[in-house]
């Protein structure tokens, strides 16, 4: 089943002579359960493409279909709700809410979804166990290591049962050993729950683990490699 | 609940900034409570000094009498009026008076002044004449008793027990008439106009002197609730009024006090306005700093599905807690100050309004329930209103730009 479908996706920044095409005529499809990495040099358009797929930015041309719904022209609350229910995000700098505990950070998105508190708490316990953070739920982000914080971010991304998880350089701030452990957790989730992951990365560990590599150069797909 | 907890905890991310903002807002509220208490205290002091000294809260006179104090403009038969006044449950007391200009003479000197004929028992309830007696006794009802002011007594070189001859014009014939009195008491109001120009005798003696048996010039009214006399009295006594009689509340009797009260209300409004600006700037500054510090975080929570409305609510709940904390702190400080000065008073010095000394030279702040309820609510509401702009600003943060800026 296709989870993501993009056709002739383009995004430009600036005007006139300063106009830059960050993404140019990008078309691809991603099936459920894929572990895909979008790779390329800095400035190749990886993050912009990830933002377009995640509904954080709208394309100037082309279309994006996510879980059967066209999102390119969604606006406001419709788009917020769609992101909340269908997309999980993992960012480079963890981006947990510092005043909430690990458990509360995970709970936050379920609160937005209107899930009742006992149900939220039960799910949080389950997911903390899944990402290997049992017993650390009460800790604030500042009291967790970088790897643990990123695991909380993974847990937050998957707890809303999204159709896809988008991860922008998730291992960039981690040492290689911690980064490897985190990737193993994500790979396990991919295997066990058939969760679809799309990474934007430079990290060779992710490239090695990915089942598909989309090479970007100057905003266009240079090569689409199935492993 | 998590939402409320998040807002509460956000408030203490930068404790020093929050406390400084709280201090600014709470100082504003404390000043507002204290200033309001002082203004209300001054209002009460002014009204009390003016109405309780001699004038009363309201007066009934013959139409035109107050213009020139023409003695022949008197109420010949006050029976109907007194009947109505007796039925009026709003009244706590009233007193009948006769007053006329005249010559006040002793064996050594003479001076012009105002002769008041009063009913001693009734008068006790509506004026401070009895309390102002510094020597001798208040009127007991005996026909030749007279009370004289300290300054006038010095001028006439008289003391207790000395004789005083009052000369006035008969109200009907305009012929001069005289009578002899003995000084039974010397009073000191502390107001020059009273102490050097007024004498008080019994009502019947004054009526006899002026040839107006049973007639009176003035009825002074005192109400259970002093605010009653601020209302339109002529409407409430409509059936009493005819072309001959007028009823005037203290605002009408002392228009200058009314003007002063308007200035005090304007003063409260100005203080409120200044506080509005101060609090607004403080809250806007604090919230914007807090939002700018968290711009990446706002980008993230927008990205994971928080709606604009939820962001607005989050900032407003934070502002509400900020206002609530500040209101609590300001209320305690403001009430403590106001309570202290309501007991001990603020020294005013010798301040006179319309020739009347204000109280005992101290201003006592007035505590009122609305200061505890409405002023803190005003401050919380003000904080919330001020937070609307930063809240909308936060809700408009574009996730991609916020994420790029932070990286």
List the predicted regions and their residue ranges.
Chain B
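Hydrophobic, regular-secondary-structure patches
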Residues: 33-114, 137-142
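C-terminal membrane-exit region of the final transmembrane helix in multipass inner-membrane proteins
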Residues: 367-407
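Transmembrane alpha-helical interface segments in multi-pass membrane proteins
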Residues: 288, 297-342, 382
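Hydrophobic secondary-structure segments that place a key small or acidic residue at a functional site
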Residues: 97-98, 113-118, 132-204
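Hydrophobic alpha-helical transmembrane segments of multi-pass inner-membrane transport and secretion
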Residues: 15-42, 262-297, 320-329, 378-385
